Each structure stands twice: as structure tokens, then as C-alpha cells.
A protein has these predicted regions:
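Helix-loop junctions on the cytosolic side of multi-pass membrane transporters
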Residues: 156, 163-192, 403-415
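Juxtamembrane intracellular "pre-TM" segments in multi-pass secondary transporters
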Residues: 179-221, 251-252
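Substrate-agnostic recognition of the 12-TM MFS/MFS-like secondary transporter fold
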Residues: 4-23, 35-57, 61-73, 88, ...
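Short amphipathic helix-loop junctions that connect adjacent transmembrane helices
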Residues: 19-34, 235-261
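Juxtamembrane helix-start elements in MFS-like secondary transporters
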Residues: 31-39, 124, 128, 156, ...
Length: 415
């Protein structure tokens, strides 16, 4: 299963649109506020569906949830490619949200279920870190392929058509996963409606208990807040790279979009190679810290500092420094993510792992739904740099309330 987990991570991140998403929307004539609104719509839909789909994954089977996820993604990609209109993009974002909610937390829970069955739960950071490393390798390769596609076609639309192929392969991969990774299912007698309600009540009642433990609550908000800031701001690297690419005295015989494609593709390739290394070595970096909670706290603060530098340097027109800060921000996120997942997995019951991780993801999407349009509005009004600075200051302000503390709480204590 180790190789299948890595294959999942690799194929999942062959999202050829990722390095060019904001540039694609700008090419279609959207403002930063409209782009932020699309991101917000996506996150609101994810927020509404996150916990119910996590419960369904725990109650009806994680494999079926993953199959539904990738089917929704495929429909979304097709709409983005075929119908370049804002109203259609809204529908495509809703379908994308369905894909995210069925997948969110579910595959992590399948990894942890495999580790539990094999009796190697102590390897959770290594397993998840290596899976994430494969994901970043997929992203690195996707950046180069996407750059080639954009360079050849002269348009960003092609990246959505190309993204369909790896996600079809993901459908076959998910179908090959063993049934044992579905986890413990709750059996309720009666009609299918009674079964659905009974399972939601049974499983849902357990995630409500998570909110009664301050230690777990801080961990959930710590992880979700940092990820919300990262995901809300990371794509603003693209217009910064665009400005830098057009300012460089290279490839002048090619068109503007072609020059941007080369610079964006190469730099995203390097970013994802670095983040792949960071994810695969998360456990080593964790060992250098005094404890897992200390590592979680330090990476939060360092990440916020990098975002502030990126925003301030963009504001002042020092794009090279901004790109370097974003490079560090991407790297840190992929070092940090396995740590926070490992921290939370020590506090969440195994049988509701998918639900518990989906709770964290729901908190993240709720925050993103608020942050994304605000960033877009600020970017339209005062520029991308100012928007990033304001977000970094806000993230720093709330840290004292999110600081996690040492001491391990066994999952059984939560029940």
C-alpha cells in the first residue's frame, strides 16, 4: 500500500492549472475581487459539505467517497475548459468543492487505518510525509508540463483539459484499494433513511466531543488558520512572477504569455522540488525541535514572517525578494503539514479519523471563505503587496490564541 499511497499523492497533484490559476482568470477578464469571490464560493460550498461528507466516508466507506471525489473533479475541469464565463465558473467551483469535501481527510484516514492494521502507527509522520513528498513531485512535474502546454498553445485554458487525464487514472487507483481501508462502519437497522440519520447522529456526536477539549480545539484552529492563510495567498505568487518575467531581458523574441509560461513553470518546478524534500524530511526536522507542539508553533510564526516579507517586498517593488519569501513559505507549509496532522492524529479517535480531520478542514475553508474576497478587494484597491501584508499581520495577531501546548492526550480519553 505504501507505493499506492505515493501514487495517489503523485497523480492527485498533477493539477496542471495550479501554477496558472490566477493568470487564467485574469486572462478571462476577471478582477481580483471576482477571483476572490470564486475562491470564497468554493470554500463556502466546502464548508457546508465538509462534515456531512466526512461522516458519510466514516459510515459508508472511504473508497466510495474517494471515487465520488474524483468524478466531481473531472466534471469541474471540463466546465472550466469548455465554458469561459464567470457564471459557469461558479458552477465549476461548486463541483470542485464536492471533490474536495469527499477527498478531504478521507485519504489521510485510510493511511492511518493501514498503519493501525499493520501495527506501525508510530510511522504516521513518515508515511504521510512521504505521501506528501510524492504529491509535491507531481506538482513539480505538472508545472513543467503546464508551462510547455501554455508555451505551445499561447493560452492558459489548455491546462484544465490536460488535468483530466491523471484524474481518470486516480479513479482506477481508488477502485484498487482494499476494502479493509474503509475503516469501522457503524451499522444501524431500518430503512436507508433511518440508517443515514442514525449513522450521522452516531458518528457526528463523536466529533462534537472534540470541541470539549481545549487542547484539541487549539490544535484544530492552529492547523486550519495557518492553512487558510497559505491557501488564500499562495496563488498571488503568479502575478508577481508575471511582473518579474516581463521585466527580465530574456526570451524577448517570444510573446508575453510564452515568456511568463517559461518563468512560472521553471520556478514552480523548483518550488515543488523543494517542498517535496521538505515534506519527506518533516520527521527529521520535527526531531530537531524540542517537541511536536514546539515545532508546530515555531513553523506558524516563521511562516507568518515570510508572508509579511513577501507582501512588503511586493509593495515596494522588490519582486526577487518577494519570490524568495514565497519560496520559503511554500517549503515551510509542506514541512509543517505532516507535523500538524501527526499532532491531531494523537488526539482524534481512530474510528472517526476522517471526520476529525474533516472538522479541521472545515474550519480552514470557513476562514478562507472570509479571507479570499478580502484579499481580492485589497489587491484591486491597493495592490497585491498591501493585501499580503494585512493578512500576515492578522495571522500574527491571533497566534497567542492558537498556540498549542505539550502533553499527549490519548484518543481513548476523548471518547
Amino acid at each position: 500500500m505504501y507505493q499506492k499511497f505515493r501514487a495517489y499523492g503523485f497523480l492527485k497533484n498533477l493539477r496542471f492549472f495550479d501554477p496558472f490559476l490566477v493568470l487564467f482568470f485574469r486572462e478571462m477578464g476577471l478582477s481580483f475581487l471576482q477571483i476572490g469571490a470564486l475562491f470564497s464560493i468554493r470554500e463556502i460550498c466546502i464548508n457546508l459539505l465538509e462534515i456531512p461528507t466526512g461522516v458519510v466516508a466514516d459510515a459508508y466507506g472511504r473508497r466510495k467517497a474517494m471515487l465520488a471525489s474524483f468524478s466531481s473533479y473531472l466534471l469541474s475541469f471540463a466546465l472550466f475548459y469548455l465554458f469561459p464565463r464567470f457564471s459557469i465558473y461558479v458552477l465549476a467551483m461548486v463541483l470542485f468543492a464536492f471533490g474536495e469535501t469527499f477527498r478531504s481527510g478521507t485519504h489521510k484516514a485510510m493511511i492511518f487505518e493501514h498503519l493501525r492494521i499493520k501495527g506501525i502507527e508510530h510511522l504516521k509522520v513518515e508515511y504521510y510525509g512521504h505521501t506528501r513528498a510524492a504529491s509535491q513531485l507531481g506538482s513539480a512535474l505538472a508545472a513543467l508540463i503546464a508551462a510547455g502546454l501554455v508555451f505551445y498553445t499561447g493560452s492558459y485554458r489548455i491546462v484544465f483539459l490536460a488535468s483530466i487525464v491523471p484524474y481518470i487514472l486516480e479513479l482506477f487507483l481508488m477502485a484498487s484499494y482494499p476494502k479493509e481501508l474503509d475503516g469501522e462502519l457503524v451499522t444501524v437497522e431500518g430503512s436507508w433513511r433511518r440508517k443515514l440519520v442514525g449513522r450521522i447522529v452516531t458518528t457526528g456526536g463523536e466529533f462534537l466531543k472534540m470541541f470539549r477539549r481545549p487542547q484539541l480545539l487549539r490544535g484544530l484552529f492552529n492547523g486550519s488558520s495557518f492553512d487558510a492563510v497559505f491557501k488564500s495567498t499562495k496563488d498571488y505568487l503568479q502575478p508577481i512572477l508575471q511582473s518579474q518575467a516581463l521585466a527580465l531581458p530574456v526570451l524577448l523574441s517570444f510573446g508575453a504569455d510564452q515568456r511568463v509560461a517559461v518563468v512560472v513553470g521553471v520556478l514552480y518546478f523548483l518550488i515543488y522540488l523543494a517542498t517535496s524534500y521538505g515534506a519527506s524530511n518533516a520527521s527529521r526536522m520535527q526531531e530537531k525541535a524540542r517537541s511536536l507542539p514546539s515545532a508546530v508553533n515555531l513553523t506558524y510564526l516563521f511562516g507568518v514572517a515570510l508572508l509579511f516579507v513577501a507582501g512588503l517586498s511586493t509593495w515596494k517593488g522588490v519582486h526577487a525578494l518577494s519570490i524568495a519569501a514565497f519560496f520559503g513559505f511554500y517549503f515551510l507549509q509542506n514541512v509543517r503539514r505532516p507535523m500538524i496532522v501527526g499532532y491531531l492524529s494523537d488526539l482524534i479517535p481512530q474510528r472517526t479519523m476522517a471526520t476529525g480531520l474533516s472538522v479541521e478542514s472545515q474550519l480552514r475553508t470557513l476562514l478562507m471563505a472570509v479571507i479570499a474576497p478580502v484579499i481580492g478587494l485589497l489587491a484591486d484597491w491597493g495592490g497585491v503587496g498591501m493585501a499580503l501584508v494585512f493578512v500576515a499581520l492578522g495571522a500574527a495577531f491571533i497566534f497567542p490564541f492558537l498556540r498549542v501546548r505539550g502533553g499527549k492526550t490519548e484518543p481513548d480519553e476523548i471518547l
